[in-house]
């Protein structure tokens, strides 16, 4: 696969992360000898080196000679890798994996892997030594989708924040000046009711102002807004059109929550799980609906590895659609007559023998690589977006089972 000078797309970076994580997850150590270190972006590399040095010293107390040697070798390898970094890690931090993994027949191989700049910032430093690498936090980052606005309010207070992946981030809060329902002596009931309504209206405007300040600048990136609180507060707030008009269209739903402090934001996320799951699949569903429309009535659809690849080379693919669950390699064959052919196989299988379909001669394997990498490399060169499609809905499952996991929506018809 040719090297790309341009910065890889976000989808491509996530896919590369996913591949490495799946490989690391399969490794096993014969004892607690596989070391994982999560390093947040604000952690000085010198502090990490000092911690690794301390762990190396403490590892000398491990009773098993083999485990002791393997742990210390892993820590030495990590220190060697850390020398390549300046004062701080790259953006979003980094994760270092190192250890002697079982390779069968009683043998071990030393593996060291560094994953830089994960999809979300690493929040805290973590040192982990076990019989398996700690990959779950990274896997959760890759599974996280979307940016959502959160608003919780009652007539006493309000909190506004973000849901970024699975991370709830409180940002703004306000307390109301709405008086209780009991009026003070000397006030007429009518005047008290009017003043109370004015205070409620002012508070709703203040909440909307917080939300507008936070969400409007991100209105083209935000995937939805959840609003929570008791009835009728949240209903009055939404029905009163207090939110900016471009944000009103982003509201996914309103939900009953008991608390409106910062903890209420997490309660709101829990209450809105169904709406969030549906929103996460919205883009995938839209892509697949368009694909099926073009497949059934238009001419701007292609599917299957070979047809999709040929359209990519012609530059005719607007969006490359790939199943998230696809795990295949592509084997490239050449025959004595210089015909080149491609065959996709399960990445766990050995390459099969191949006969050239053009001339019938026996073909020789000349290369083998990850099939998705192969297509994305062409897509990057042609300005084609790559969208990974979930199998958590019917048409997404059909992409994998009925169309081989590869499809494309075309810019123009090619007849291929």
Swiss-Prot record:
Its main location: cytoplasm. Keywords: Cytoplasm, Protein biosynthesis. It comes from the Archaea. The keyword Signal does not apply. The keyword Cytoplasm applies. GO terms for cellular component: cytoplasm. Heterodimer of two subunits, one of which binds GTP. Directs the termination of nascent peptide synthesis (translation) in response to the termination codons UAA, UAG and UGA. Belongs to the eukaryotic release factor 1 family. HAMAP family: Rel_fact_arch_1 (MF_00424). This is Peptide chain release factor subunit 1. The gene is prf1.
